[in-house]
Curated annotation (Swiss-Prot):
UniProt keyword list: Transcription, Transcription antitermination, Transcription regulation, Transcription termination
GO aspect biological process, one term: DNA-templated transcription termination
Family matches, as Gene3D superfamilies: 2.30.30.30, NusG, N-terminal domain (3.30.70.940)
Annotated function: Participates in transcription elongation, termination and antitermination.
Gene assigned in the entry: nusG
Protein name per UniProt: Transcription termination/antitermination protein NusG
Domain of life (superkingdom): Bacteria
Alphabetical list of CDD domains matching this protein: KOW_NusG (cd06091), NGN_Bact_1 (cd09891)
Family: Belongs to the NusG family.
HAMAP family: NusG (MF_00948)
Annotated GO CC locations: cytosol
Taxonomic lineage: Bacteria, Pseudomonadati, Spirochaetota, Spirochaetia, Spirochaetales
A Pfam family that the UniProt record links to this protein: NusG
Family annotation (InterPro entries): KOW, NGN, NGN-like_dom, NGN_dom_sf, NusG-like, Rib_uL2_dom2, Transcrpt_antiterm_NusG, Transcrpt_antiterm_NusG_bac_CS
Length: 184
C-alpha cells in the first residue's frame, strides 16, 4: 500500500459536487478504506471592485480535484474504476486507461495546501485589483488625499500605481499603494 495524493480531472464547475459525492461514498464504505480524503482546492482572494473590498473563494485548479489514496498493489484497478464511475469524473491525470495512476509529489501537495490555508503560510489571502492604465482614479489618504488623476503604470508585485496628478498646473507622477486608490 502506498498512501499519496493524486489529481483527478473532472467536468469544470462540478468540482464541489464531485467532492461531495466521493466523500459520501467514503462515508458509506464503498472504497473500503482505500480512498482517505478528497478536496476541490480553493483559495481565499481579496478582491477590490469599484472601490469595495470583498473576500471570495476561487478554485486553484478549475476542472481538477485532489484525492488521497492508500492504493494497494493488488486490486487497485477496481478502486480506480469505481472512482472514474463517479458522475463528472473524467480520469486520473497523466495516465491512460488501465494504467496505475501517478501521485503528485509532496512539494506540490504542500504548495496547494498553503494556498488553501490548510498549511500555514505567510499570507493565504491574495489580492485582486481591477485597475487599468489610463483609468481615472481618486487618491484616498496620505499627502495627496482627494487628488484625482490618471493611472500611468501598475506594479502588481509591489502593489503600487503611478498616478499622474495635477500639481500647480503640471502633471506630476505620484506613486500610491493600491489600497489608497478608488475608482471614479
Amino acid at each position: 500500500m502506498s498512501r499519496a495524493w493524486y489529481v483527478v480531472q473532472t467536468y469544470s464547475q462540478y468540482e464541489k459536487k464531485i467532492e461531495q459525492d466521493i466523500r459520501l461514498l467514503i462515508n458509506e464504505g464503498v472504497f473500503g478504506g482505500v480512498v482517505l480524503d478528497v478536496k476541490a482546492p480553493i483559495e481565499k482572494v481579496e478582491e477590490i471592485r469599484n472601490g469595495k473590498k470583498r473576500i471570495r473563494e476561487r478554485k486553484i485548479w478549475p476542472g481538477y480535484i485532489l484525492i488521497e489514496l492508500d492504493l494497494p498493489e493488488v486490486g487497485w484497478k477496481d478502486i480506480i474504476a469505481n472512482i472514474i464511475k463517479v458522475q463528472g469524473v473524467i480520469n486520473f491525470v497523466g495516465v491512460s486507461k488501465g494504467q496505475r495512476p501517478i501521485p503528485i509529489n509532496d512539494e506540490e501537495v504542500k504548495s496547494v495546501f498553503m494556498l488553501t490555508g490548510e498549511i500555514k503560510a505567510n499570507k493565504s489571502i491574495f489580492m485582486l485589483y481591477d485597475f487599468e492604465e489610463g483609468e481615472r482614479v481618486r487618491i484616498k489618504g496620505g499627502p495627496f488625499d482627494s487628488f484625482e488623476g490618471l493611472i500611468s503604470s501598475i506594479d502588481y508585485e509591489r502593489k503600487k500605481l503611478k498616478v499622474a496628478v495635477q500639481i500647480f498646473g503640471r502633471s506630476t507622477p505620484v506613486e500610491v499603494d493600491f489600497q489608497h486608490i478608488e475608482k471614479i
